[in-house]
Swiss-Prot record:
Keyword Cytoplasm among record annotations: yes
Biological-process GO terms, alphabetical: DNA recombination; regulation of DNA recombination
Iron-sulfur listed as a keyword: no
Recorded family membership: Belongs to the RdgC family.
Keywords per UniProt: Cytoplasm, DNA recombination
Disulfide bonds: none
Gene Ontology molecular function: double-stranded DNA binding
Lineage: Bacteria, Pseudomonadati, Pseudomonadota, Gammaproteobacteria, Lysobacterales
Any one of the GO CC terms: cytoplasm
Main subcellular localisation: cytoplasm
Protein name (record): Recombination-associated protein RdgC
Amino acid sequence: MFFRNLTLFRFPTSLDFSQIDSILPNARLRPVGPLEMTSRGFISPFGREEQEVLNQRQGDFLWLTVGSEDKILPASVVNDLLTRKCSEIEEKKGHPPGGRERKRIKDDLIHELLPRAFVKNSRIDAMLDLRYGYVAVDTASRKAAETVISEIRDLLGSFPALPLNAEISIRSMLTSWIAGEPLPEHLNLGDECEMKDATEGGAIIKCQHQALRCEEIDKHLEVGKQVSKLALILDDHVSFVLGDDLVIRKLKFLDGMLDQLEHSDTDGIRAELDACFALMSAEIRRLFLLLEVPLKLSKANN
């Protein structure tokens, strides 16, 4: 259940979530209809089989999950059928169908195929820190994260969440860290980075599984390359790659945190998930607060 990526948003801490239990059932995921391409809504963080509990709240942390049902209708299948249909019409009439008729035929084909299309189920989890006013969505895709925020906005009626941004150049800060400037307390360099030329469309250098403070890296810095992604480690609890887009990728929880689970008194899958969420949310908060000051992360207006 541990998140693997974090796309972050800020929201005002003054927002009221006290009615979340009563309004979530109205936004529950419903099965995609026979003539629909997609359906989205909230499902239980504990799985689709759970019908009663549609969120998990632990103190200031709220866990929401958006589920999706998407019809799989490959464009190649539709286009092949469209070509055959148009060929049949051309044989009968002596000329191919025009653009408007071709579009109508394609729409009819999609309408015919949809009820028989396979359905793909997916989910995206989000953790809301109600005390510090940020959402961590478990995806590296900005578009997918915005979909989750949109669902929360529809649920609440109003949810003024904005993508996380910084008042400084993230590339400059990441570059300074790899060049030898002190990192924030508790953070250490990992073994991966991506470096880019300052000019648009310039060279991109990717380094993995190597020490980042070395002569090879120094040479790239000397010619003006800047760090766009940097692997970091928070104590021995969390490793991750921070990008200049402020998306956290390759999030991994390490033995320093996982050892706490082994010593926790949990009985059953549900209790284990509760314990995992409690530890994960605490570590994500610690990471967020650790980065907030040096990166001058944006705040939401209350």
